[in-house]
Amino acid sequence: RKCIGCKACEVACVMAHNDEQHVLTPQRFLPRITVMKHEQKRNAITCRHCENAPCARICPTGALQQDDGIVTMNAQICSGCQLCIMACPYGAISLESIGLPSATSETMAQKSMRSVAVRCDLCKDWMKREGKSVPACVEACPVHARSVVQIG
C-alpha cells in the first residue's frame, strides 16, 4: 500500500508524545516521523531501528541503547552533541529543546530547557499507557501504508 501524503502519521506521532500539551502550534508540532514527497511519490521517513545502529554505537553518553532490536533514548543523559544525527543514515534524528530537571535541581518542578536528540521510539510509552499493540503512526494511517516488521 502506498502513502498518500496525508500526514496523519505525523499528527498521531505528535499527539502520542505531547504530554497533554496543545500540539497544533508550530512551536509544539515536532513529529518523530516526516512525510516526504518526491515527484509523485510520498513516503513517511522515521527511524529504522537498524541492526547494529550507528547512532547507538557513536553516542558518547550511552543515551542511545539498542535493546531487543529497538533503539531506545534516555533524554536524561543525552548531551545534545548531535553525533547521532550525523551518524543516522536515514536522517531520522532531530534536536529538540525540552524541559528536563537541571543538573543542580532535584525535582521535575525545577526544569531547565536544553537540547536533546529526539527520534522514533515506536511509541513504547504510549502503547503501554493506552493499551495499544502498534505505534500511533501505524494506527492512524488511513490507507494502512505503515506497519511494524518484527525481525528475528
PLM regions: where:
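Non-ligating segments of multi-cofactor redox enzymes
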Residues: 1-152
